[in-house]
C-alpha cells in the first residue's frame, strides 16, 4: 500500500494576537502537510528531529494524535525550535524564529521507498 513520507523541520508556533499569546501549535511546511495526510488515514511517516524537551514531546504527541508514525523521528539533546507568530489585524503572521543550529536527521534509518510512495520535503 502506498505511504506518504514527510521530511523537514518541526517547530512550535506560539501565536500572538494584540501582543498576547493565544495558542501554541506544532508546525513546519512539510510537517503541516504530513499531519493533514495522517488525519485522513493515509499511512505516513515523518523524518525529522526535535529536542528531547517539553516542546519536543508536545510535537511527538501531536504527531501520534494525528496518525503520523514517529518511527524515523529523532529527539536530540538540542533545544526544540520555537517561532513567535505575531498576527496583524488582517490575521497575517509575522514571525520571529528561535532555533538551534538545525541538523538533518542522521542516525535513524528511513523507511524503504516503494515505486508508488510519495515524499514530501521542506526546509531545514
Region annotations inferred by a language model:
Residues 1-68:
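Glycine-rich phosphate/adenosyl-contacting loop at the front of the ribokinase-like
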Residues 7-8, 122-124:
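Glycine-rich beta-strand-to-loop/alpha-helix junction loops that act as flexible
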Residues 43, 47-123:
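Conserved N-terminal subdomain of the carbohydrate kinase-like
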Amino acid at each position: 500500500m502506498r505511504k506518504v513520507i514527510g521530511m523537514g523541520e518541526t517547530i512550535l508556533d506560539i501565536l500572538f494576537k494584540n501582543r498576547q499569546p493565544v495558542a501554541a501549535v506544532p508546525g513546519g511546511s512539510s510537517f503541516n502537510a504530513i499531519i493533514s495526510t495522517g488525519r485522513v488515514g493515509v499511512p505516513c511517516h515523518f523524518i525529522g528531529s526535535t529536542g528531547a524537551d517539553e516542546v519536543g514531546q508536545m510535537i511527538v504527541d501531536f504527531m501520534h494524535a494525528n496518525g503520523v508514525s514517529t518511527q524515523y523521528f529523532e529527539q536530540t539533546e538540542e533545544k526544540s525550535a520555537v517561532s513567535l507568530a505575531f498576527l496583524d489585524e488582517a490575521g497575517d503572521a509575522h514571525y520571529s524564529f528561535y532555533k538551534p543550529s538545525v541538523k538533518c536527521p542522521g542516525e535513524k534509518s528511513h523507511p524503504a521507498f516503494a515505486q508508488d510512495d510519495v515524499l514530501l520535503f521542506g526546509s531545514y
